[in-house]
Regions:
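A short, conserved structural fragment
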Residues: 64-72
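Short acidic, hydrophobic short linear motifs in intrinsically disordered regions
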Residues: 36-46
Length: 240
């Protein structure tokens, strides 16, 4: 099956009414919160997805009845074995779609996350399996985040929050969290400065914002942008 056929089949199977699956979206969000070191709470889902508090509470209650998660005594959301398996599957499809969109179709780096949010809900298991073959040796998504199930990353995916690394000197941008991925305009600004995973960066705090500088091989600043401290918490870096 050619890559064009994979794309055609995926789109043919997509029903517009099924492009967004709320349960899958919530499961993936909980998994992403865990990945970013954020305690999964209903309030955090409100922040991430922009849904109202009552809507999130109703959806979470339904998911608990369906055996996908538990609401713990401290309000933390804990995925059940079934819920985690489903969440992992959705996240893997999302990140495979991102790689296909960027590496094969040639979509702009700043736009592939938003587009993949639609694809993750309509990709069949057969298409997923074929993409895994066609995109072999792909263990991270375009934003440096791990591909679920990639054994090559076992024990190697550690990075530090950018806000904990202020004034730490020259660093390497390791990965970019979902809240920044969801901002297409901000991602485009990152791209213009070459601020992709693997780039050399310098960080400094200025009040309630963080300056993220793009550095050349000599450590000279090529350009920079400023982002709110809250967003900087979703940049992950490594020391050189």
């Amino acid at each position: 099956m050619t890559l064009f056929c994979v794309y055609y089949r995926l789109m043919k199977e997509a029903d517009v009414a099924d492009l967004i699956d709320t349960t899958e979206m919530y499961l993936k969000t909980i998994l992403e919160l865990e990945e970013d070191g954020v305690t999964p709470l209903r309030a955090r889902i409100v922040d991430r997805l922009g849904h109202s508090g009552p809507t999130v509470s109703q959806t979470v209650a339904r998911m608990e009845r369906d055996g996908l998660l538990h609401v713990m005594g401290d309000r933390r959301l804990e995925l059940t074995e079934t819920g985690r398996a489903h969440a992992t599957e959705v996240l893997r499809k999302h990140r495979l779609a991102e790689r296909l969109l960027l590496d094969v179709i040639g979509m702009d780096w700043a736009q592939v996350h938003d587009e993949a949010c639609r694809w993750e809900h309509v990709m069949s298991d057969a298409v997923e399996a074929r993409l895994e073959e066609l995109l072999s040796n792909t263990c991270v998504d375009p934003y440096g985040n791990p591909m679920p199930g990639c054994e090559q990353l076992q024990g190697t995916h550690s990075a530090e929050l950018a806000v904990r690394s202020l004034e730490a000197g020259t660093l390497t941008l390791a990965r970019i969290g979902e809240p920044i991925q969801a901002d297409t305009e901000l991602l485009a600004s990152f791209d213009e400065l070459g601020l992709r995973p693997g780039a050399r960066v310098g960080l400094s705090a200025h009040g309630d914002v963080v300056r993220v500088a793009s550095l050349d091989e000599a450590g000279e600043v090529r350009g920079y942008l400023t982002i709110p401290m809250a967003l900087a918490a979703h940049l992950f870096v490594r020391g050189e």
